């Protein structure tokens, strides 16, 4: 069963949008893409709330949990972890029920 993780977060003071996008790019290339069961990531930004959203898909909840344990100790995730306002981070982990795609 595919698992979707939705993370809402803010960055610490002084990090620009472009800088954070670069940090996330490094995280995806050097950390998430190497984790068992990782499928993909989307990054979104809410201007009015000054919040970032990361949507990820994983092959299983166990794969997601293993990667989540590693993110705080892996050197390839260090810049990402340091850039977050840790009190702002909120996560939802949900099983995919159905998907629809454009078939035209």
Regions found by a protein language model. Name each.
Residues 18, 68, 103-104:
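Short, charged, solvent-exposed linker or helix-capping segments at domain edges/interfaces
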Residues 10-22:
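Short, surface-exposed ligand-recognition loops at beta-strand->loop->(often short) alpha-helix junctions
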Residues 24, 28:
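Short amphipathic alpha-helical/adjacent loop interface patches that line ligand
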Residues 21, 53, 72-73:
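Residues in and immediately flanking transmembrane alpha helices
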Residues 15, 49, 62:
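Short alpha-helical
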Residues 1, 9-12, 42-49, 53, ...:
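Glycine-rich beta-strand-turn "strand-cap" elements at beta-sheet edges
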Residues 30-39, 57-92:
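An amphipathic, aromatic/His-enriched active-site/gating alpha helix that lines ligand/cofactor pockets
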